[in-house]
């Protein structure tokens, strides 16, 4: 029984950073204003020859494609290699969606089952696990951030080797996809997701710490009342 409790608790802690990161990734992927920000910042219009309205139209169609059942992105702007790579990107995004739903489902089921079984005694343990999960989120992103500062190229290469089973991501410098989405575009997107996840982790951890502090004070008062009663 103790082993099962430990395993389910560890999975709960793991699901916290998974849920935060996939949720923020989903938001970033679908938030068209982030695309607009990147296009303006990196002067994509000048690089591609497309005006801002055309760029946003392509981005909007791309977001729709990521959330559709279409196998390929039907657009003349990209060549076959780019379109095929975009299919792989869509698969990665859809995987993130599934991980988001799976982690959310596990967290909800875990909380409901433990509350039914343990009632009020569960809240202290839940608060601790939320703090651990929040801490794990911040630690993971801190490690990745430090790695990126020390050797970004190796992190970038490892991400693509793990994420894709082919070399289609190695596009030519003149390909429209690279011109539309330069490396800085993805760096900013990653920073947005990381900052959002860290902020959410701090909030969750802070609330959980507050719950522990309040319950600790309540228990302390009960002990004092009990001691005074006996006295």
Segment roles from a protein language model:
Residues 167-225:
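Terminal transmembrane helical module of multi-pass membrane proteins
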Residues 1-34:
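Hydrophobic secretory-pathway targeting helix
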Residues 21-29, 67, 142-155:
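C-terminal TM-helix exit segments that contain a strictly Trp-centered aromatic cap at the helix terminus
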Residues 66-103, 185-197:
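Individual transmembrane alpha-helix segments
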Residues 2-7, 104-154, 204-227:
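Juxtamembrane interface at the cytosolic side of transmembrane helices
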Residues 1-11, 82-95, 122-129, 180:
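Membrane-interfacial loop-to-transmembrane-helix junctions in polytopic alpha-helical membrane proteins
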Residues 147-174:
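Juxtamembrane non-transmembrane "cap" segments at the membrane-aqueous interface
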Residues 34-76, 82:
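Membrane-interface interhelical loops and short interface/amphipathic helices
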């Amino acid at each position: 029984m103790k082993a099962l409790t430990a395993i389910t608790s560890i999975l709960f802690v793991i699901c916290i950073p998974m849920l935060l990161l996939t949720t923020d990734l989903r938001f970033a992927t679908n938030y068209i204003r982030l695309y607009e920000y990147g296009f303006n910042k990196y002067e994509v219009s000048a690089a591609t020859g497309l005006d801002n309205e055309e760029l946003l139209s392509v981005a909007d169609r791309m977001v729709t494609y990521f959330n559709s059942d279409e196998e390929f992105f039907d657009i003349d702007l990209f060549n076959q290699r780019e379109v095929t790579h975009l299919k792989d990107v869509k698969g990665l995004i859809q995987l993130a969606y599934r991980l988001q739903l799976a982690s959310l489902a596990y967290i909800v089921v875990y909380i409901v089952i433990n509350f039914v079984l343990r009632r009020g005694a569960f809240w202290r343990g839940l608060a601790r696990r939320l703090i651990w999960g929040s801490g794990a989120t911040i630690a993971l992103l801190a490690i990745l951030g430090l790695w990126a500062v020390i050797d970004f190229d190796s992190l970038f290469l490892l991400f693509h080797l793990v994420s894709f089973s082919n070399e289609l991501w190695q596009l030519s410098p003149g390909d429209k996809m690279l011109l539309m989405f330069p490396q800085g575009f993805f760096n900013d997107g990653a920073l947005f997701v990381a900052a959002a996840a860290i902020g959410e982790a701090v909030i969750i951890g802070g609330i959980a710490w507050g719950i522990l502090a309040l319950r600790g004070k309540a228990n302390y008062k009960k002990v004092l009342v009990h001691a005074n009663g006996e006295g």
